[in-house]
């Protein structure tokens, strides 16, 4: 029997998603809790492996088990066995052919910036603090040149192991609400550090250090050395993973916190 779970977590104290020796990971904590509930060792697969310090409200995992448990055992039971910064949002039995990563058709991330002179004490690990003056409208304008299918080598980490740098970005919106700036981006898949590298480059435009047209120029150059720095991990959230509708997986509010599902000026997508 194959089970899919929707997971959210605060990644602040974890060394990323993937299980590693001698450091804590989100995968390790979930597998330990699942193994207790199932009464056998459990190995999980996820939709997207997040880096150290990165959060998720819409991570999806799957695992195989022959343990016959009610839905409440997987949700309430798991949440009582997980640390406070990891939680299950939903559970669904799926076909054996379902795969959390390979069945997905798109991923969506949000990057949350706290743009204020002084750092925040509340939610400090859930946002990235930038004190410089930032124009979110300029960031949004520049980001539109990234829409469509492109070679994103410029925004790819050196250690990225993907076979191809080509990705299809279907939505990118940058908006401001008071001191908070949110970059909302959706694509069929993402390269390692792609969202954080895009954010770091758009921030240079928002700070007036580069013109709007610069983003299109560095994208075409396919050279990581020409782009901006990698933005900090703390503001990044995996908020949604798309799957074919016939799978019937639950749809939950994206978040984080108060953020609406639709970006300003759009309908849901």
UniProtKB/Swiss-Prot annotation:
Key words, A-Z: Isomerase, tRNA processing
Residue numbers binding substrate: 109
Record flagged with keyword Transcription: no
Active site, renumbered: 51 (nucleophile)
E.C. number(s) listed in UniProt: 5.4.99.12
SUPFAM superfamilies: Pseudouridine synthase
Transmembrane portions of the chain: none
Function of the molecule: Formation of pseudouridine at positions 38, 39 and 40 in the anticodon stem and loop of transfer RNAs.
Self-association and partners: Homodimer.
Annotated PANTHER family: PSEUDOURIDYLATE SYNTHASE, TRNA PSEUDOURIDINE SYNTHASE-LIKE 1
Protein name, as recorded: tRNA pseudouridine synthase A
Organism listed in the record: Aeromonas hydrophila subsp. hydrophila (strain ATCC 7966 / DSM 30187 / BCRC 13018 / CCUG 14551 / JCM 1027 / KCTC 2358 / NCIMB 9240 / NCTC 8049)
């Amino acid at each position: 029997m194959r089970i899919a779970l929707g997971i959210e977590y605060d990644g602040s104290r974890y060394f990323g998603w993937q299980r590693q020796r001698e450091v804590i990971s989100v995968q390790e904590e979930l597998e330990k809790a699942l193994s207790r509930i199932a009464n056998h060792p459990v190995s999980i697969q996820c939709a997207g492996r997040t880096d150290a310090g990165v959060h998720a409200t819409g991570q999806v995992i799957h695992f195989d088990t022959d343990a016959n448990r009610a839905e409440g055992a997987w949700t309430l039971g798991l949440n009582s066995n997980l640390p406070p910064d990891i939680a299950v949002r939903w559970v669904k039995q799926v076909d054996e052919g379902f795969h959390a990563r390979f069945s997905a058709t798109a991923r969506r991330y949000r990057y949350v910036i706290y743009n204020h002179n002084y750092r925040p004490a509340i939610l400090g690990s859930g946002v990235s603090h930038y004190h410089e003056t930032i124009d979110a409208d300029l960031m949004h304008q520049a980001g539109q040149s990234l829409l469509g299918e492109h070679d994103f080598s410029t925004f790819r980490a050196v250690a990225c192991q993907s076979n191809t740098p080509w990705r299809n970005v279907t939505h990118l919106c940058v908006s401001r609400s008071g001191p908070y700036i949110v970059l909302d981006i959706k694509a069929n898949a993402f390269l390692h550090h792609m969202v954080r590298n895009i954010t770091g480059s758009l921030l240079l435009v928002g700070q007036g250090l580069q013109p709007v047209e610069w983003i299109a120029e560095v994208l075409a150059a396919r050279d990581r050395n020409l782009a901006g720095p990698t933005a900090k991990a703390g503001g990044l959230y995996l908020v949604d993973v798309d799957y074919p509708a016939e799978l019937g997986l639950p749809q939950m509010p994206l978040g984080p916190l108060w953020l609406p599902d639709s970006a300003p000026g759009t309908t849901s997508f």
